């Protein structure tokens, strides 16, 4: 299936969650028992599905991201994209990899110095709290980085809710049990 404006348009095979721009139901799935609202408001918008991609090594992930981000820039040249990571070391790894791939309009964000210009900004999830981007890519969402703990669930919630249009999730190795459970729940019929 090919969708305009998403990473599927370049041939990635993905696992799709039931909804894209996170609606209260999807937010509840991500938060689990930590949901703060007893009755979340109804969502008034829908969007492309959440896309989850698993890789065997970081190099393959970076190469695929570079290809997908180049395609996205051609289709939506004014889009703002945040590549959000669990920590500074992962941010540096992905930033260097995308620099080597010669991705245009790429910026490394430190100390919340976001430009909000079209292009790709790489930073840690914690730095993006309270901000929104057209596309958000949560990278390295593996079991080691995000174990099934309340702090991990909260951090993933912060990252996932930054996306206005679409959320992409990548993982090298074993997917976080939190995300695996959320995807499983979102794919069940009501």
Where would I find each of the regions flagged by the language model?
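Core RecA-like ATPase module of SF1/SF2 helicases and allied nucleic-acid translocases
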Residues: 3-25, 44, 59-63, 70-168, ...
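Polar low-complexity intrinsically disordered regions enriched in Ser/Thr and small residues
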Residues: 8-9, 35, 50
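Short, compositionally biased "basic patch" segments
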Residues: 20-46
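Glycine-rich phosphate-binding "P-loop"
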Residues: 39-67
């Amino acid at each position: 299936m090919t969708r305009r404006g998403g990473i599927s348009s370049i041939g990635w095979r993905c696992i799709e969650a039931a909804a894209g721009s996170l609606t209260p139901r999807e937010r509840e799935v991500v938060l689990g028992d930590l949901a703060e609202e007893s009755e979340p408001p109804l969502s008034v918008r829908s969007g492309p599905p959440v896309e989850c991609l698993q890789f065997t090594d970081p190099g393959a992930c970076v190469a695929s991201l570079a290809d997908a981000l180049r395609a996205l820039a051609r289709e939506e040249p004014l889009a703002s994209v945040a590549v959000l990571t669990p920590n500074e070391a992962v941010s540096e790894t992905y930033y260097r990899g995308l620099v080597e791939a010669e991705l245009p309009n790429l910026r490394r964000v430190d100390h919340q110095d976001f430009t909000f210009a079209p292009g790709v900004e790489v930073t840690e999830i914690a730095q993006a709290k309270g901000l929104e981007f057209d596309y958000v890519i949560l990278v390295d969402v593996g079991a080691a980085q995000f174990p099934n703990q309340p702090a991990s669930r909260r951090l993933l919630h912060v990252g996932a809710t930054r996306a206005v249009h679409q959320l992409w999730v990548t993982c090298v190795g074993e997917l976080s049990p939190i995300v695996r459970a959320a995807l499983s729940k979102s794919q069940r019929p009501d």
